[in-house]
Amino acid sequence: MTGSKMLFACLALIAFLHPLVHVASAQECTTPNNKAGKCLGIRVCKPLLEMLQTQGHAAADFLRQSVCKYENNNPIVCCPNEESREDRGILVGNEYEPLRPPHCGFSNVSHTRVVGGKPAVLGAWPWIAALGFRYPRNPALEPLWKCGGSLISSRHVLTAAHCAEINELYVVRIGDLNLVRNDDGAHPVQIEIESKIIHPDYISGVTKHDIAILKLVEEVPFSEYVYPICLPVEDNLRNNNFERYYPFVAGWGSLAHHGPGSDDLMEVQVPVISNTECKNSYARFAAAHVTDTVLCAGYTQGGKDACQGDSGGPLMLPKKFTFYQIGVVSYGHKCAAAGYPGVYTRVTSYLDDFILPAMQ
């Protein structure tokens, strides 16, 4: 059995196991390495989050053994006390691999059906990244935020190639809610980009292979409001065309065609349509390439879609209590124009040949 399959099997068993740590009371516990701790939600346990972000799959067995219990399918783990934190680096490993539930894709917010675009609430999309660009004539100014992305590991952000190819792109901000206010309760992380990995077959100005990965200069510290999204690596997701599903898209893009970007993080839910229907919609546009490497989502009547500034952001599918990224915002006609769905790079088409190798 491969390492990935072993990990998946290991995590799948957690829900059926009794707690593996010794729990002395409702709060106190003993960690797998015999340190005193308290049972907390994994999203607020900094030592285990640090282990997860730096050691990835290598941390899986220790994390599995740290489970105290589950509450509403959310793992409660034995979090070491402050004096025990020097022992957190127990495991070895520095490869960045796709994380699996429950270590990704968890949102603090219950998402009901969104029938129209609306502002997101704090903690709803902890993996959403705003991409920052330098002003060519005045690099000292604050970044210009004009593309989106998603955190997929502690060092990698997934985005669109047509965003990554711009020379002025240099920084990402993750976990923000309002890009200009500091009183929104968010605690965003802003980290510069070390390198850009653009799909080798992408050609500037052409809509094919519109996908890229940004490697950051340092680890992103996971927290309650900064957390990665899951990639659709399981077979039941890889082999799904997602037609008639209603995924979410979120970003700080324009609210109208050629309008200014939104300061507030906005979200909308859109239905995935067939590629045949999508191809017919874009038949008169020679530059539109609707192939099996993209998926399309939107309403026939228009009015709800990703827009300028949302480019590179994630199309997010909820499965039970976990969100998976199934698309990357690529292009559309105007902004939520009637008869023209949004076109997204299909993540499952690029997992093995591009995304996973680029994360190593």
Swiss-Prot record:
Its main location: secreted. Disulfide bonds join C29-C78, C39-C68, C45-C79, C104-C230, C147-C163, C278-C296, C307-C335. GO terms for cellular component: extracellular region. Ca(2+) binds at D176, N178, R181, D184. Residues 1-26 form the signal peptide. The keyword Calcium applies. GO terms for molecular function: metal ion binding; peptidase activator activity; serine-type endopeptidase activity; toxin activity. It comes from the Eukaryota. GO terms for biological process: proteolysis. Residues 114-360 form the Peptidase S1 domain. The active site is at H162, D210, S311. Expressed by the venom gland. Keywords: Blood coagulation cascade activating toxin, Calcium, Disulfide bond, Fibrinolytic toxin, Glycoprotein, Hemostasis impairing toxin, Hydrolase, Metal-binding, Protease, Prothrombin activator, Secreted, Serine protease, Signal, Toxin, Zymogen. It is found in: Secreted. Residues 27-113 form a propeptide. The keyword Thylakoid does not apply. Glycans are attached at N108. Its EC number is 3.4.21.-. Residues 28-79 form the Clip domain. Belongs to the peptidase S1 family. CLIP subfamily. Multifunctional venom serine protease. In insects, it acts as an arthropod prophenoloxidase-activating factor, thereby triggering the phenoloxidase cascade. When injected into larvae, it induces a lethal melanization response in target insects by modulating the innate immune response. In mammals, it converts fibrinogen into fibrin, activates prothrombin, and also degrades fibrin. In mammal, it may act in a cooperative manner with the serine protease inhibitor Bi-KTI (AC G3LH89) to promote the spread of bee venom under anti-bleeding conditions. PANTHER family: ACROSIN-RELATED, HYALIN. The clip domain consists of 35-55 residues which are 'knitted' together usually by 3 conserved disulfide bonds forming a clip-like compact structure. This is Venom serine protease Bi-VSP.
